[in-house]
Amino acid sequence: MAKKIRGGEIIALIGELGSGKTTFTKAFGKALGIRQQISSPTFVMMQQFETPKGLFLYHLDLYRTKNFADVKSLGITEWWGHPKTVTVIEWADKILDSLPKNTTIIYLHRDA
């Protein structure tokens, strides 16, 4: 998936606690060439990383948000779809109806 990234993509991750949303983002970032430690941004809500190709990976965690108004008030949506960004959103189900139509949605499930 990371090999097909050109910029402007938005990836929505949906799954319960412990289903692998952050693990997916770590592997995705590594595949993009990011060497920094990627962790869950639950308390800061967003982390930004630059790839060797000059793209910026924005990693969002919406666990503590209630709705799209919370996200929009932070100014986060201003760079969605920008050709120099790739956005991965954890807990995207909270704003699914407000995401652009070309968003890639990935559902993750925990093993029993």
What kind of feature is each model-predicted range?
Residues 30-33, 69-71, 77-112:
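Short phosphate-coordinating micro-motif centered on Lys-Gly-acidic
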Residues 34-49:
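Short beta-strand-centered segment that lines the nucleotide-binding/catalytic pocket of NTP-utilizing
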Residues 57-67:
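Switch II (G3) loop of P-loop NTPases
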Residues 10-12:
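Short hydrophobic/aromatic beta-strand immediately N-terminal to the Walker A/P-loop
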Residues 1-4:
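Pre-Walker A adenine-sensing motif
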Residues 21:
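Conserved lysine of the Walker
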Residues 14-16:
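P-loop (Walker A) phosphate-binding loop of NTP-binding proteins
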